[in-house]
Regions:
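Active-site cleft segment of glycoside hydrolase catalytic domains centered on the general acid/base Glu
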Residues: 44-46, 74-78, 105-206, 210-232, ...
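Aromatic-rich peripheral "rim/lid" segments of glycoside hydrolase catalytic domains that contact
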Residues: 255-259, 276-334
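N-terminal Rossmann-like NAD(P)+-binding domain of SDR-like oxidoreductases, especially those catalyzing
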Residues: 333-537
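Hydrophobic faces of well-ordered beta-strands that scaffold small-molecule active sites
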Residues: 31-37, 62-64, 93-97, 138-140, ...
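NAD(P)-dependent short-chain dehydrogenase/reductase
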Residues: 473-495, 508, 514, 518-592, ...
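C-terminal substrate-binding subdomain of Rossmann-fold SDR/epimerase-dehydratase oxidoreductases
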Residues: 358, 364, 400, 558-694
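Residue-level signal for the nucleotide or nucleotide-sugar donor/cofactor binding architecture
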Residues: 115, 255, 403, 432, ...
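N-terminal substrate-binding region of glycoside hydrolase catalytic domains
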Residues: 20-126, 132, 139, 145
Length: 694
């Protein structure tokens, strides 16, 4: 099992105390972990994608369905052959041999195969013979509850099912396969006792539990109690069958990411030999039930990843840090006891670059802080580790999504002030998934505003918007001046872009952030909320793990330090003003101090005309720091890219007395030193070159 890397030591954080029982990152996980995933006939890409997911999670067990209806359809045997050839040598397969559809049905389904039970035994024999040596176990369709699916009369169903399972189990054993009786519900053990009386358990090697703790209507006693009850039935029947969890999971339809993680870790600690988690990915397909009205929307959202392959929190932390990382994160997530009178500053998106820096400053000043974050951005869990190591007593971590209205309302209840950094921050992501972009940026902000309004007491809010609300600024006449663009207008060159400029939303990202921007201002005007909007330019500094889409200053530095090429979109002369994060924190604190005077207003926040840089100039500065000019490659301009944006910050300076102190060269040097010390080793220098590579 891969161990969680000691990033705390690597980043210069205080070392863990070996005497602290919470310092041990290793948690014993006795169960073998598998994943449940159903594949639609012909969808080879889905198979390949899931195999890649399993490798990332270091999982070698896969439970999947081979259905008679698919197998006997035109091209069915060929598809099953293709599926097994993809899986062979990659994973150990537990095939669920079913008469019905391969569509994963979720907990709404009773687990029963549909069709003629008389055909089932023949089908089991065909599959075992065709794929000789491909698997050691076969799972027979259980889920027996005395109802549904079979063509015989209702009063005959119980006996017919038991006889079918017994014959199929004996046939599988005759071919050298061990038998799993799947779909056993711990809350409905009368059916298991009936199968025992019919002799079915004598032909079964494993009983597979199908349970989804924590879902609505789930009368759940806990894994240990549930498993003990099943083992009692087995003991009474004289059966030596083992017990696995063959189907469990937790959906994220309501963005309950922390609950999915908690349910996953709870299942791993159950006293069984094997656990199969549902599912690798959310469902692309509508569930195929006889009674379509019984389909639950949550059944589509059990995946560790979305249907398009995006990580959810559990998936990403598991892939990057292993199971130990999940246990550590669970320990760091601290919820307030209820009821509680403890007040705190709420920072949504507080595990990110800006949020973690602000949390550190407030905690260092003796304030209580709640960080609410879904950890969707790679690397931010390191910030949580750092905060947890430095400020355990006053830090509250709520692993939640801003789209989860209930979680947001709970977090706001005891807040005395709020800083909102939760956002989908990448223009490129907004172009590929505009619905998610809108849900996070616009709907998420509305959730927060409604929670503040429901509190019926003043909770001052600082909302971080973006300069993208001003659009592409194509009407600003520019000229090339050396390695940068500058406005033809002398006034713009000296002062930058002011708040009086008309809004012009470009790109879905600009639209969603602009929508949220205007909602915050309007709630301040019409609902009486205390709130200000910061339309921010480029922020940089320690604890920034940059990507091409956000945190580009850190991204450039990291790529250069790794001797990797930097992609420059356009000609590299585009100009931005840079604001060091410590100066931004000063602005945040002043906003709360002066909230009564500035509420309902928007302010441009950035380094201003005195702290500007073009991409080409930044590359040269990085070369001076590293001793080698970065490698670059150029791509076409991206949609909605601004060739020039510099904030006019005079309005905010006059309102609060704020003034940035850190210049570009000093700030970039400080970020480089932090990255060198805490994030990356610096490779051996190449000879310095006289120009940026084109």
């Amino acid at each position: 099992m891969r161990r969680f890397s000691d990033t705390a030591a690597r980043e210069g954080n205080p070392p863990r105390d070996p005497a602290d029982p919470n310092s041990n990152d290793d948690r014993p996980v006795a169960a073998l972990i598998g994943i449940v995933e159903w594949f639609q006939p012909g969808d080879e890409q889905h198979v390949d994608d899931v195999l890649a997911d399993l490798r990332a999670w270091e999982v070698t067990e896969l439970r999947t369905c081979i259905a008679r209806t698919d197998y006997e359809a035109t091209g069915g045997p060929e598809w099953c052959d293709c599926l097994m050839s993809h899986l062979n040598g990659q994973v150990q397969v537990l095939p669920v041999l079913a008469l019905g559809s391969t569509t994963y049905l979720g907990p709404s389904n009773n687990g029963m195969p549909h069709g003629d039970p008389g055909e089932y035994v023949t089908f089991v024999q065909k599959v075992i013979q065709r794929y000789e040596g491909a698997f050691d176990y076969v799972e027979l369709c259980g889920g027996f509850n005395g109802a549904g699916g079979w063509t015989c009369e209702p009063e005959m169903q119980a006996v017919a099912i038991a006889e079918m399972l017994l014959q199929a189990a004996n046939a599988a054993r005759e071919h050298g396969r061990r038998v799993v009786l799947g779909g056993v519900a711990p809350q409905k053990l009368d059916s298991l006792r009936f199968l025992a009386r019919c002799g079915v358990l004598e032909a079964v090697d494993v009983v597979g539990i199908r349970a989804f703790p924590g879902l609505a209507g789930s009368d759940w006693p806990g894994w240990r109690t549930a498993i003990d009850r099943i083992r009692t039935v087995l003991s009474e029947a004289g059966s030596r069958a083992g017990v696995w969890i063959t189907e469990t999971g937790y959906p994220t339809a309501g963005h309950s990411l922390a609950r999915q993680m908690d349910a996953f870790l709870a299942a791993l600690e159950a006293p069984v030999d094997r656990v199969y988690w549902c599912t690798a990915r959310d469902s692309h397909h509508a569930p195929q039930l006889n009674d379509a009205a019984s389909v639950d929307e949550q059944d589509r959202h059990f995946g560790l990843k979305t249907a398009t392959g995006q990580h959810k929190m559990l998936s990403r932390i598991w892939a990057e840090h292993g199971l130990e990382g999940l246990y550590r994160l669970q320990r760091q997530s601290r919820r307030l006891p209820q009821p509680s009178t403890r007040r705190y500053t709420l920072i949504t998106g507080g595990a990110g670059f800006i949020g973690s820096n602000l949390a550190h400053r407030l905690l260092s000043a003796g304030r209580n802080v709640m960080v609410l974050d879904n950890l969707s951005r790679p690397g931010v869990e390191r910030n949580l580790e750092w905060l947890h190591a430095m400020h355990t007593d006053r830090l509250i971590v709520e692993l939640a999504d801003i789209r989860n209205s209930a979680a947001v309302h709970r977090a706001v209840q005891k807040a005395e002030q709020i800083f909102d950094f939760s956002a989908q921050v990448a223009v490129t992501t907004s172009l590929t998934d505009p619905v998610q972009d809108f849900e996070v940026n616009a709907r998420g902000t509305l959730n927060l505003l409604e929670a503040i309004r429901a509190a019926q007491r003043p909770i001052p809010l600082v909302y971080t918007s973006t300069n993208k609300v001003y659009g592409g600024l194509h009407d600003v006449r520019l000229r090339a001046f050396g390695d940068r663009y500058e406005p033809v207008s002398r006034c713009l060159r000296l002062q930058g872009i002011g708040e009086q400029r008309s809004l012009d939303f470009h790109s879905p990202y600009g639209c969603s952030k602009g929508t949220a921007d205007q909602y915050v201002l309007d709630y301040a005007r019409t609902m009486g909320l205390s709130a200000v909007v910061f339309r921010m330019s480029c922020i940089y500094g320690p604890r920034q793990f940059g990507t091409e889409d956000q945190g580009w200053v850190a991204h450039f530095l990291i790529r250069a330090m790794q001797a990797l090429p930097i992609t420059v979109y356009g000609d590299g002369r585009q100009v931005r003003d840079l604001l060091f994060v410590e100066d931004l924190l000063d602005a945040f604190e002043l906003a709360q101090t002066h909230m009564s005077r500035i509420s309902g207003q928007a302010f441009n926040i950035g380094g201003g005309p005195a702290r500007t840089v073009s991409l080409l100039e930044l590359l040269r500065l990085i070369g001076e720091l590293t001793g080698q000019l970065p490698l670059t490659r150029h791509e076409d301009w991206r949609p909605a890219d601004q060739k020039y944006y510099v904030s006019n910050t005079l309005k905010y300076q006059r309102a609060t007395g704020w003034c940035p102190r850190v210049g570009v060269e000093e700030g970039v040097r400080r970020l480089y030193e932090w990255l060198s010390r805490a994030h990356l080793p610096v490779p051996a220098a190449r000879p310095a070159e006289c120009a940026v590579r084109q």
